[in-house]
Amino acid sequence: MRRFELIAPCHFGMESVLKREITDLGYDITEVADGRVTFFGDEEALCRANIFLRTAERILIKIGNFHAETFEELFQGTKSLPWEDYIPKDGKFWVAKAASVKSKLFSPSDIQSIMKKAMVDRLKSQYEISWFPEDGASFPVRVFLMKDEVTVGLDSTGESLHKRGYRKLTAKAPIAENLAASLIMLTPWNGGRILVDPFCGSGTFPIEAAMMAANMAPGRNRSFTAEEWPHIVGKKIWYDTCDEAEEMVDLSVETDIQGYDIDEDMVKIARENARMAGVDKLIHFQRRGVEDLHHPKKYGFIITNPPYGERLQDKSQMPALYRTIGERFRELDSWSMYLITAYEQAEKDIGRKADKNRKIYNGMMKTYYYQFLGPKPPKRREI
């Protein structure tokens, strides 16, 4: 089998969670950098990473890296890479995204254009042809520039891995599925204790939690760009990995996951999304406002993404909303609460300083993941 260096981008601040996921899959980490984790793996690893990783955004095959401070250096560095090892004569190839941080070359469109020209030059000389039909499989390329160091990767995923295939309907500001999974994995929740999302919207937190509880691979019901690359990854490897994912699913698991929302239409959407994900039997959705948040069970988890006044007309309502969250949480005195929000007065209005607070970028928006820790449940006595 071919051996690759694979790059898995993720949300900034979630690198440690992704690193743990990759290690649990059995692969060796080579680098952890801001917003990405790099590891070694073969063709099977590429398939398994795409299908099993919950917190990654995509999986790139690292083509190479080089130093470039000028467009000429960028051109020559790109041209020196072994593109013919990956892209066939009829391949459709382009630089899908270029990102530059603290580098002399900073214009994404110029970087993309020059790299495409360099790729064409390289492939012309290797294949000894002057024109490419580009009517075959797709080979999108992604490039990162950090302090003039250029890292080039071939995107094996296509649409971002957060697109699991179940969320056909959404709330106004839904949280990305892979970010929701990352935030759940930052908690001690493991399926054995109740989990409630009192602002469930389209149901992302409860659905991702249910998929974890049922050991359901997030990529089992979607396609990937690399499925069109039989010269790199054989079809049988994809089939075998999909079979592995199906065999792992356990819908008989006992778990208590609940999602509430004040909007009945959102509750209906959440139920439909859960059905599409195949976990509707594992989640109880209900129309309920946060002021009615209560539960007889002890040692539960609240994991949620409450409103944070992103619209001007909503800002005045935020203090009262977060005070209500704090009041309800104090009544659940054995519970833990985890909430992601961009509302900077959250701790003040909740009435308690968070035990932990992690800054996370949700897209371009700076948010905070407040972690209010409850007591640990007593250990069961051994019989």
PLM feature spans:
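C-terminal edge-of-domain segments
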Residues: V141-T157, Y370
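C-terminal catalytic and target-recognition region of SAM-dependent MTase-like enzymes
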Residues: G289-I383
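A short, flexible beta-alpha/helix-coil linker loop
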Residues: S100-S103, S160, P307-R311
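SAM-dependent Rossmann-like transferase core, predominantly class I methyltransferases
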Residues: V152-L186
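Conserved S-adenosyl-L-methionine
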Residues: I175-H295, E310-R311, Q317
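Non-catalytic nucleic-acid substrate-recognition regions in nucleic-acid-modifying enzymes
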Residues: R2-F139
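Short, charged/polar, Gly/Pro-enriched secondary-structure boundary elements
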Residues: E44-I51, E159-H162, P378-R380
